[in-house]
A protein has these predicted regions:
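Single conserved hydrophobic/aromatic residue that forms the stacking wall/gate
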Residues: 2-5, 9, 13
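Short acidic, Pro/Gly- and aromatic-enriched capping/linker segments at domain boundaries
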Residues: 26-45
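Active-site neighborhood of glycoside hydrolase catalytic domains
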Residues: 248-269
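Exposed beta-sheet edge/beta-hairpin loop segments within beta-rich domains
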Residues: 40-48, 238, 242-243
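Aromatic-rich carbohydrate-recognition surfaces in CAZymes
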Residues: 118-120, 124-226, 244-248, 252
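Extended glycan-interaction surfaces of carbohydrate-active proteins
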Residues: 16-24, 29, 52, 59-60, ...
Length: 269
């Protein structure tokens, strides 16, 4: 952790505290013990009207000018929490995370949850498009699409094998189409849409199959295939093996939407 302050300073000696217990983490089955480092504190004098920029980062921030530029950009992005709606908008923005390597991800929930394809697709319209941040929506979708394998979303996205997650992708694109138009959707995401449908037609990892009746069958003993994804001793509490109603509703929507865009833009493949 890199700590810096924009002026001469004095930093007191660090120390370490041992054996912190987190009862909620233990109750949820997580490792609930941790040692914590205190970095001490900066000590300096301020005159009337002066300001100080303090930074904490995983990488070195660089020059004082760089820190000032980052600080100014951060201030410009902030929302003014003056009423209920602005507080909601501010909270929603905290779930959109930009990471190194041109990655934009959506955290499913603080403090325990990571990145989930399903939760990303379901939440993106509300936390980006409704606030006028379509570029964030596009960046998050592009991050997941770059890491697609065999029609499923992998990378850092948890629940990558769930049968419904890739199909929520189509629903999110339908919301994005209102902002950018169908032509751009098909140009940017048409190949991914066709890859997903083709993977379901072929079958995915012995867990997802398209049957002759046109319905999607999803079943597995070791991983949850739907949003009911609680595990006990490494096995799904509610497996729901078979024709899940929401999976097939999403499947029907995905097929219809893909055919609609393909027809409008002359793609017969």
């Amino acid at each position: 952790l890199h700590l810096s302050i924009r002026r001469q300073r004095q930093m007191c000696i660090r120390d370490r505290y041992y054996g912190f217990e987190y009862q909620q983490d233990l109750a949820r089955g997580y490792d609930g013990y941790e040692d914590l480092l205190t970095t001490g504190y900066f000590e300096t004098e301020l005159k009337k009207g002066e300001s100080i920029i303090f930074s904490a980062s995983l990488d070195e921030m660089g020059s004082v000018k760089t820190i000032e530029e980052v600080f100014a950009a951060s201030i410009a992005r902030r929302t003014h929490k003056i009423d209920f709606i602005s507080c909601l908008e501010h909270s929603a923005r905290q779930f959109v995370i930009r990471r190194p390597g041109d990655r934009t991800e959506v955290v499913s929930g603080y403090p325990w949850h990571g990145v989930s394809g399903r939760q990303t697709f379901v939440s993106l319209p509300g936390i980006t498009l409704e606030q006028g941040h379509k570029e964030d929506c596009i960046d998050a979708l592009d991050t997941l699409v770059r890491e697609m394998r065999d029609g499923m979303f992998t990378g850092n996205a948890s629940a990558a094998v769930a049968a419904d997650a890739p199909l929520w992708f189509f629903w999110t694109l339908q919301q994005l189409e209102r902002e950018v138009g169908g032509k751009q959707i098909w140009k940017a995401y048409g190949p991914a849409m066709k890859d997903i449908l083709e993977s379901y037609r072929r079958g995915v990892g012995g867990r997802v199959a398209l049957h002759d009746n046109g319905l999607v069958w999803a079943a597995a003993d070791d991983v949850p295939m739907t949003w009911m994804n609680a595990l006990i001793d490494g096995r799904p509490v509610t497996p729901r093996n078979g024709y899940q109603v929401e999976v097939n509703a999403l499947w029907y929507n995905a097929v219809c939407y893909t055919l609609e865009l393909a027809g409008k833009h002359g793609d017969k493949a």
